[in-house]
Amino acid sequence: MNFIHDPLTPRVLFGAGRLQSLGEELKLLGIRRVLVISTPEQRELANQVAALIPGSVAGFFDRATMHVPSQIVDQAASVARELGVDSYVAPGGGSTIGLAKMLALHSSLPIVAIPTTYAGSEMTSIYGVTENELKKTGRDRRVLARTVIYDPELTFGLPTGISVTSGLNAIAHAVEGLYAPEVNPILAIMAQQGIAALAKSIPTIRSAPTDLEARSQAQYGAWLCGSVLGNVSMALHHKLCHTLGGTFNLPHAETHTVVLPHALAYNTPAIPRANAWLQEALATREPAQALFDLAKSNGAPVSLQSIGMKEADLDRACELVMSAQYPNPRPLEKHAIANLLRRAYLGEPPQP
């Protein structure tokens, strides 16, 4: 056995009611002038968070949006400068936390993330921004949240459909982590536990959305899966999703949900060790098919067509994916990638 484990992770507060610790956490971090960030739809949550720290709120920015458009980043940065803030508090999902990351990248100010979905972005130093219909990603320690507060009670309002796709989005992070070059025994255990926790909790959340134990297990799984992604490099799955989301404006979690079984099936012949770990985590001999079935049986989309992809754009998507080779367990083959995209578009079962 020979490996390096150099974890890059924020401080984590976890548990029902943990949001009430926000004021104490800001004092611990020496934070005094907060910009509270949200999407327009989650402004009420932003107000709820601000009410806990009335003396520390410098202002709000409630125009966060999917895929972090560069013009929104510029608008938020201008507001932050005008208010003279010293930090960002980001209650919400990937859109809100993603915007906070881009602001931190340019200002080096700390983030306190309060995730309300299972996307896992809060646990990584990965950032992304969309400019001219192309999504660019990178890594930088400046964008890693200083503290993450997981309060499963905040996920009660997450619609069941979004809960399912957000959970599968998190699973995708850990799946890709299991065949990353940086994987080690510790990350493998975290990935397996995260995948198992989410796979078990998703059906319960769909049938009982306010089941606190299921919501807690899902956030626990999201924390683990996000932590794995934060310590490994990304490969085919995330490349596909960034291309489809950033260029064709497909919804983030739904795109991950649709693509995951197909990207895994493509790589399966080249990842025997990771496949064995996945078989154990999902209690199945066919992990790719099991993930397809998990999505379909819980009402999640299984086709790109159903989430807004146009058939006429499949060729362009394939060209974009093939335009820059990058590390992947199985070399990228244009004909095979085109077939993968076609199956994902139609919602057909995954194939190697």
UniProtKB/Swiss-Prot annotation:
GO BP field: 2,4-dichlorophenoxyacetic acid catabolic process
UniProt cross-references to InterPro entries, sorted A to Z: ADH_Fe/GldA, ADH_Fe_C, Alcohol_dehydrogenase_Fe, MAR
Reactions that this protein is recorded to catalyse: 3-oxoadipate + NAD(+) = maleylacetate + NADH + H(+); 3-oxoadipate + NADP(+) = maleylacetate + NADPH + H(+)
Keywords: Aromatic hydrocarbons catabolism, NAD, Oxidoreductase, Plasmid
The enzyme's E.C. designation: 1.3.1.32
Pathway this chain belongs to: Aromatic compound metabolism; 3-chlorocatechol degradation
Pfam families: ADH_Fe_C (PF25137), Fe-ADH (PF00465)
Keyword GTP-binding recorded: no
GO molecular function, one term: metal ion binding
UniProt record similarity statement: Belongs to the iron-containing alcohol dehydrogenase family.
Classification via PANTHER family: ALCOHOL DEHYDROGENASE (PTHR11496), ALCOHOL DEHYDROGENASE 4 (PTHR11496:SF102)
Protein name, entry field: Maleylacetate reductase
Gene: tcbF
